[in-house]
């Protein structure tokens, strides 16, 4: 075991070996292989290339070097292309702070039986007068940044439960194509987290309709991990034991305290210390120690999968139109 695996329990070490192909004997070589690819994307400012940071991406992609680098590139490209989202990217930012206080997201104290962190969202808590959907996405991304520092969660991953109770048609009408795409790109395509399941409960018909619209834009692996339970909490309990769930989900624990995770972040004054601005992303790519092969040096080679969603032009009016009309 190397110092990079110091935070893992023996059980998680074995899981990383069997499920993620993690090998302590080649760990530093694996990391360097990914780091050496940075020079193939001079259009991106890679603000972090340290061992611990790259390791997150290798674990998220089961130590497939090229896939890990593609995710790393998309991580920084997403931030580079959405600079406004990452200005004041900290828990004390007014929009993020209010979203956190309303439980966007929440985090249960107990892990599930696979060691995964359970995140919860109560959609109806969104107060449109105080913060935006983008603020909610920022709060979720900031929370994931804090949680993913735990090496156990890098290996075991997360589960998300979204309760759609009392989420109104008017609120749903704010979910524009551009907003949904921003969320999909940020969470599915650009973040080194392993999501083992996304559970919808108490979803109304119009949320089911929205899911039908966005489903083609989700990766097959993501689609297989989304479960629409409706009002059938028994089906949820077959996948997540009720002993660790709050009463809102038919569990045996007391009602969830919406401010629990917010207090954790605010007490530690957590923020992402990366400088997300135009200057930082225009800095030259750092020199790497090892020379790359001629094939990997081809600058015309893109690491972005052409099947990944093409980013919408923010000026395209149709992308700002609601998927559900109130008319």
UniProtKB/Swiss-Prot annotation:
GO terms for cellular component: clathrin-coated vesicle; early endosome membrane; endosome; trans-Golgi network; trans-Golgi network membrane. The keyword Membrane applies. Pfam families: CRAL_TRIO (PF00650), CRAL_TRIO_N (PF03765). It is a peripheral membrane protein. It is found in: Golgi apparatus, trans-Golgi network membrane; Cytoplasmic vesicle, Clathrin-coated vesicle; Early endosome membrane. The keyword Phosphoprotein applies. Residues 287-327 are annotated as: Disordered. One of its GO terms (molecular function) is phosphatidylinositol-3,5-bisphosphate binding. Keywords: Cytoplasmic vesicle, Endosome, Golgi apparatus, Lipid-binding, Membrane, Phosphoprotein. Its main location: Golgi. InterPro entries: CRAL-TRIO_dom, CRAL-TRIO_dom_sf, CRAL/TRIO_N_dom, CRAL/TRIO_N_dom_sf. Required for normal morphology of late endosomes and/or lysosomes in neurons. Binds phosphatidylinositol 3,5-bisphosphate (PtdIns(3,5)P2). Forms a complex with clathrin heavy chain and gamma-adaptin. The CRAL-TRIO domain is required for targeting to the membrane and for binding PtdIns(3,5)P2. This is Clavesin-2. It comes from Homo sapiens. The gene is CLVS2.
């Amino acid at each position: 075991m190397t110092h990079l695996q110091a935070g893992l329990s023996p059980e998680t070490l074995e899981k990383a070996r069997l499920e993620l192909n993690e090998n302590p004997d080649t760990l530093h070589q694996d990391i360097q292989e990914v780091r050496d690819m940075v020079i193939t994307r001079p259009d991106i400012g890679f603000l972090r290339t340290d061992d611990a940071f790259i390791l997150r991406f290798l674990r998220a992609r089961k130590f497939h070097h090229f896939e890990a680098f593609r995710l790393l590139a998309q991580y920084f490209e997403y931030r580079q292309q959405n600079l406004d989202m990452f200005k004041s990217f900290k828990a004390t930012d007014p929009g993020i702070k209010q979203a956190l206080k309303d439980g966007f997201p929440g985090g249960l104290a107990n892990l599930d039986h696979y060691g995964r962190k359970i995140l919860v969202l109560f959609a109806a808590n969104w107060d449109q007068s105080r913060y935006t959907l983008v603020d909610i996405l920022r709060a979720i991304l900031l929370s994931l940044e804090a949680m993913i520092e735990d090496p156990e969660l890098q290996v075991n991953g997360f589960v998300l439960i979204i309760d759609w109770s009392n989420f109104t048609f008017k609120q749903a009408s704010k979910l524009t194509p551009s907003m949904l795409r921003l969320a999909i790109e940020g969470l599915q395509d650009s973040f080194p987290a392993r999501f083992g399941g996304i559970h919808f409960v108490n979803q109304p018909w119009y949320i089911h309709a929205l899911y039908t619209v966005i489903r083609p834009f989700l990766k097959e692996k993501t689609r297989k991990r989304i479960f629409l339970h409706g009002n059938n909490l028994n089906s949820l309990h077959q996948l997540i034991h009720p002993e660790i769930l709050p009463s809102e989900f038919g569990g045996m624990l007391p009602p969830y305290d919406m401010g629990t995770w917010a207090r954790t972040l605010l007490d530690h004054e957590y923020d992402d210390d990366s400088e997300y601005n135009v200057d930082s992303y225009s800095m030259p790519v750092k020199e790497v120690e090892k020379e790359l092969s001629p094939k990997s040096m081809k600058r015309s080679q893109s690491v972005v999968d052409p099947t990944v969603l093409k980013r919408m032009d923010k000026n395209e009016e149709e992308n700002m139109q609601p998927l559900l009309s109130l008319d």
